[in-house]
Amino acid sequence: MPTRAILFAVAVLMVTSTATARAQKTELKWGPAPPSLPSGARMAVISGNPAAPGPFTIRLRLPSGFTVPPHFHPVDEHQTLISGRIGHGMGDRVDVRAVKWLRPGQSITLPANSHHYVKTRGRTLVEVSAVGPFTVTYANAKDDPRKR
């Protein structure tokens, strides 16, 4: 009887690992980032919907030298750097000397309504999680790409 139980457990583990492997092979669907971000950014939705109520996770591909001018969100924003370099600064104007750079695997949480800006070095892939609806409000209206 113990042999049958062991064989059953092994079979269950094999089926589970096959299903997991299939789920991880799903290709992300990349498209342009929302118009609230400067041009050049690409976005893929991992889960949820940033425009709807509830949790969501997205990935952003950002070109080298990309800058998101000072802005804020009504909710906490959680970022995990996957590749490249991403830097964050706080305040209503960009100060490159004040930027704190993340390395791949590092994370940052930007509190709701905190004014911050983002810069990249090299092609950058970052995962962003928050609760929607997620909005971007620029500290300086002239920086808003939707108004150009």
Q: What kind of feature is each model-predicted range?
A:
Residues 1-8:
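Bacterial N-terminal signal peptides that target proteins for export
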Residues 8-17:
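Bacterial N-terminal signal peptides
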Residues 19-58, 141-148:
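A short, N-terminal "cap"/entry segment at the start of jelly-roll beta-barrel domains
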Residues 43-47, 58-66, 70, 95:
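N-terminal post-signal-peptidase region of extra-cytosolic proteins
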Residues 49-51, 63, 86, 92-113:
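Short acidic-glycine-tyrosine-enriched beta hairpin
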